[in-house]
């Protein structure tokens, strides 16, 4: 699927950025560095690139007819994957520069961005590939239409994140700047466990959000997690971490449930 293709393209782009960076000012190059330098030599103009930017990297993918770049991802999706790789690498270089000036602000030396070891990676669709029609989201090459709530704004992009055997969609809209009006009244919010939120205001109105639903799902999660880990840990070293797809799904359920509760509470508030 797209998530696997995005992962392959991410690693292919990062491979070229990393090896171009490590080959800089070196005489004895590794086989990987020689391969990347050979590809860069195909580009007319400057022969050496310290850190290939988005424009250089995209040209490199096209001129070499890179199979991961032309694997079937929508073109703007593939371009975003490459752009994100360049952004992450430049962010690492900026952090490294700050670390060398003042290491006290870091717990350790920033590590170079690593390859994606999972079988899938996050990606996005722009509004040229993802559209909302008749209250349903249409994504490329997917027959299922996903119902979405109508928003007052223009859909800009859809971010797709693989989560526990499924996918989490984040829809980004462009809306007009809302004017914030400062009112004459005030309210206070107190967060707790038994009562998730207690809200009072100077208008005399108050609202109380019970926390038993969140406590209940959290207790259920901890109970099932302990049972499964105990079962999986039999005959193994106690220091060895055990995990499974079932625990992934269980964790995702707990997270989604609690997130949904807070969204509903904030909406009512």
Predicted stretch roles:
Residues 1-269:
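Nucleic-acid substrate recognition interfaces
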């Amino acid at each position: 699927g797209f998530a696997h293709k995005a992962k392959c393209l991410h690693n292919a782009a990062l491979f070229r950025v990393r090896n171009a960076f490590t080959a800089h000012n070196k005489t004895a190059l590794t086989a990987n560095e020689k391969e990347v330098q050979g590809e860069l030599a195909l580009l007319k103009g400057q022969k050496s690139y310290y850190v290939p930017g988005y424009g250089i990297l995209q040209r490199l993918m096209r001129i070499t007819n890179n199979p991961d770049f032309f694997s079937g991802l929508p073109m703007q999706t593939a371009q975003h994957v490459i752009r994100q790789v360049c952004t992450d690498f430049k962010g690492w270089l900026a952090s490294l520069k700050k670390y060398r000036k003042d290491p006290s602000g870091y717990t350790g030396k920033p590590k170079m961005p690593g390859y994606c070891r999972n079988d899938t990676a996050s990606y996005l669709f722009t509004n040229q590939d993802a559209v909302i029609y008749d209250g349903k989201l249409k994504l490329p090459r997917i027959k299922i239409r996903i119902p979405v709530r109508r928003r007052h704004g223009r859909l800009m992009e859809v971010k797709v994140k693989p989560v526990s055997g499924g996918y989490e969609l984040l829809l980004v809209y462009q809306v007009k700047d809302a004017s914030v009006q400062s009112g004459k009244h005030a309210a206070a919010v107190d967060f707790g466990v038994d009562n998730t939120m207690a809200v009072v205001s100077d208008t005399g109105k108050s609202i109380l959000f019970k926390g038993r639903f969140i406590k209940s799902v959290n207790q259920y999660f901890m109970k099932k997690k302990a049972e499964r880990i105990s079962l999986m840990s039999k005959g193994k070293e106690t220091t060895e971490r055990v995990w499974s797809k079932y625990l992934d799904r269980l964790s995702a359920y707990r997270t989604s449930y609690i997130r949904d509760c807070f969204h509903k509470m904030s909406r009512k508030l």
